[in-house]
């Protein structure tokens, strides 16, 4: 009789007869803009551009392979610099962790290759490594690549993707802003071309130095570009900023960019610029 008045259990444990199959890591990718989930291989086949137009981040190697002709790329070795100039606590361990995770030595990869037959020196920042922050190694790599381009009389491009100066290197990091700008000035004085392509995100000391010094300043759609953060600016001026503030489209309308170029059109865009500024074309017009 007591069993009749007992309350039924609210929860019932069900045993699964089959072992759950885990989805492999990296099989699917979710777009942060439209929330679409699609196969990663399908996204990569479309240059990592979602159907909604959102440009997913590229690795440095992917950027080189998308822009340059196959079989023409020669990567530069990183210049030898002290990895931890200020003996910052835990910094060496963080560097090693990023090196293992990304397979990179630092937050930048530099090299030379051909874009539809036109030679070009390129520096590509990779935000996976210390958020693409600029330290002594990054500054030295950019400076040496520009020095090589000046010596060989080649155009140069830099793909920026950075959170700014690397805080663990303090003043040494800030010095790279002036150092890279100086080498770009020498490159410009030699009458050579520099194209700056800003990708998401390009902020801090990078946006205040070499990223904005191009003969052509272009950016990918939807890229965040600016020096200080949105919240800091709003608190300083005590005003609400536009929703599209610090986007590449906003900067284009304000006249701070020459163009916003989709990833699908980037190689064609570079080809036109390099063709116009090649030495052969210049000699033909003299």
Curated annotation (Swiss-Prot):
Q: Which cofactor does it need?
A: Zn(2+)
Q: In which pathway does it act?
A: Lipid metabolism; malonyl-CoA biosynthesis; malonyl-CoA from acetyl-CoA: step 1/1
Zinc finger (C4-type) in chain: 31-52
Q: Which residues bind Zn(2+)?
A: 31, 34, 50, 52
First-listed, main subcellular location of the protein, grouped into a coarse class = cytoplasm
Tell me the ranges covered by the CoA carboxyltransferase N-terminal domain, including all copies. 27-286
| Record's keyword terms, sorted | ATP-binding, Cytoplasm, Fatty acid biosynthesis, Fatty acid metabolism, Lipid biosynthesis, Lipid metabolism, Metal-binding, Nucleotide-binding, Transferase, Zinc, Zinc-finger
Return the InterPro entries for the record.
AcCoA_carboxyl_beta (IPR034733), Acetyl_CoA_COase_Trfase_b_su (IPR000438), ClpP/crotonase-like_dom_sf (IPR029045), COA_CT_N (IPR011762), Znf-ACC (IPR041010)
| A cellular component term, taken from the record's GO annotations | acetyl-CoA carboxylase complex
Q: What does this protein do?
A: Component of the acetyl coenzyme A carboxylase (ACC) complex. Biotin carboxylase (BC) catalyzes the carboxylation of biotin on its carrier protein (BCCP) and then the CO(2) group is transferred by the transcarboxylase to acetyl-CoA to form malonyl-CoA.
Assembly behavior: Acetyl-CoA carboxylase is a heterohexamer composed of biotin carboxyl carrier protein (AccB), biotin carboxylase (AccC) and two subunits each of ACCase subunit alpha (AccA) and ACCase subunit beta (AccD).
Name assigned to this protein: Acetyl-coenzyme A carboxylase carboxyl transferase subunit beta
Organism of this sequence: Exiguobacterium sibiricum (strain DSM 17290 / CCUG 55495 / CIP 109462 / JCM 13490 / 255-15)
- The gene name reads accD
